[in-house]
Design a protein with these regions (language model features):
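N-terminal small/glycine-rich loop or linker at the start of catalytic domains
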Residues: 1-5, 66-96, 138-147, 176-197, ...
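N-terminal hydrophobic targeting/anchoring segments and the immediately downstream early-domain regions
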Residues: 1-61, 65-80, 363
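Short, acidic/polar
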Residues: 12-25, 112-122, 207-212, 275-285
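Divalent metal-dependent hydrolysis catalytic cores, especially in the metallo-beta-lactamase
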Residues: 31-37, 129-135, 290-294
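Glycine-rich tight-turn/loop motif centered on a GG-T
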Residues: 37-38, 80-109, 142-161, 189-207, ...
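Second-shell residues forming the walls of enzyme active-site clefts
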Residues: 37-57, 61, 163-330, 343
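Glycine-rich, aromatic-flanked loop segments that form ligand/cofactor-binding clefts
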Residues: 53-80, 112-138, 158, 162, ...
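Extended, intrinsically disordered, low-complexity segments
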Residues: 317-363
Length: 363
């Protein structure tokens, strides 16, 4: 039986160092998040993923690869996927001459399914297990950090297009992760740089932004909360709030999958209860609030990765001191995100009928 391995960490470059192999072998580390700096070409990425799996086959290899401006791998054959707003625009476009009223919506859902398949199949062909997608935020025209990453303003359209994208991901053998619960689209501040505050009531948020999480709760395999404070619900950001993660997401909306923190190095994750906190305290807060895994980005390039080592040591110490207990259910949810079937290799994928048809459907 595996121990709960909640830490998702990054690596510095195109190949693993000895220190990184040692970190990845630690039983509290459950996965790796990749960035553009880890990319040279497909052959290098595939080799890096094999190196990671050689350390431990159960390590989850993840990436933010949504399409549009958030796509880490863009060259050497990777399809330049459109932003999710393109599918919402397709949905809202007028029917072509002679078409029925629902034709644009059908075209949009088919295109979103195709995008999910292309996205998942290309990543899996290189050894990546999971992309943190789809974005379920609503586009209010307020948030520059969300913007065209969102499908649409209407939660019904967002839900149907996200379900289509997830269907395509599933066809490729990849899971999914809806973000940023309960919604990041209404606030202007960028949580990478500041602490966004959304002053709406719980009722208003549930009726709009959080609605997709309830409608999709049976098919969402993972969720990533927003580093946003909703003071009429809780004084803590959603990712550190048991009110949001347990009472609302799990009990009220019925979500049973994995909960990832958003990046703990973001500015909005470094302030809790009116004071600055370190990575270790933020990680403990996220886990005790109901999170299954905590994501720590871009620390492998800081002082030789010492912030990661300190976080591992602090979490180990917290376990010994009884401040945190591993959760077998969390580990089951992490392992469930690992692909079950073997991936199609790149050359075979490029000539497969399903892949070529999917490419033809993209906007």
């Amino acid at each position: 039986m595996h121990q709960h391995a909640p830490l998702i960490i990054d690596v510095a470059g195109h190949r693993l160092t000895t220190a990184e192999r040692q970190r990845l072998a630690h039983p509290l580390v459950g996965g790796v998040i990749l960035f553009a700096r880890n990319w040279l070409d497909r052959a290098q990425l595939t080799k890096l993923c094999r190196q990671i799996k050689t350390v431990r086959p159960d390590l989850l290899i993840a990436v933010d690869h949504e399409g549009g401006r958030v796509q880490r791998f863009r060259t050497d054959g990777f399809t330049h996927l459109p932003p999710m707003a393109a599918f919402g625009g397709l949905w809202l476009s007028p029917p072509k001459k002679g078409e029925g009223e629902g034709s644009p919506a059908m075209r949009a859902t088919n295109a979103a399914t195709a995008a999910g398949y292309v996205l998942g199949a290309e990543l899996r062909a290189c050894g990546v297990d999971l992309s943190f997608t789809p974005v379920l935020d609503l586009d209010y025209g307020e948030s520059s950090v969300i913007g065209d990453r969102a499908f649409a303003r209407d939660p019904r359209v967002v839900s149907l297009l996200a379900q289509s994208l997830m269907s395509g991901l599933q066809q490729s053998g990849m899971g999914n992760c809806g973000k940023h619960f309960p919604g990041h689209g209404f606030v202007r501040a960028d949580s990478h740089l500041a602490i966004p505050v959304d002053k709406r009531s719980l009722k208003a948020i549930l009726a709009e932004d959080a609605a997709p999480y309830g409608w999709l709760s049976s098919s969402l395999q993972a969720v990533m909360p927003a580093h946003v404070i909703y003071p009429r619900v809780d004084s803590r950001p959603a990712g550190f709030s048991s009110r949001w993660l347990q009472d609302v997401l799990r009990h009220q909306l019925g979500f049973t999958g994995a909960i990832f923190s958003d990046d703990l190095s973001m500015e909005a994750a470094r302030h809790l209860d009116g004071r600055n906190v370190g990575f270790a305290e933020a990680a403990l807060a996220a886990l005790t609030a109901g999170g299954d895994m905590v994501v720590l980005c871009n620390q492998s390039v800081v002082d030789g990765g010492s912030p990661i080592d300190e976080a591992i040591e602090a979490l180990s110490r917290a376990q010994v001191e009884g401040l945190w207990s591993p959760n077998p259910a969390s580990e089951d949810r992490r392992l469930a995100l690992l692909p079950r079937a073997a991936a199609m290799d790149w050359d075979t994928l490029m000539v497969s009928a399903r892949y070529m048809h999917a490419l033809s459907l993209l906007p």
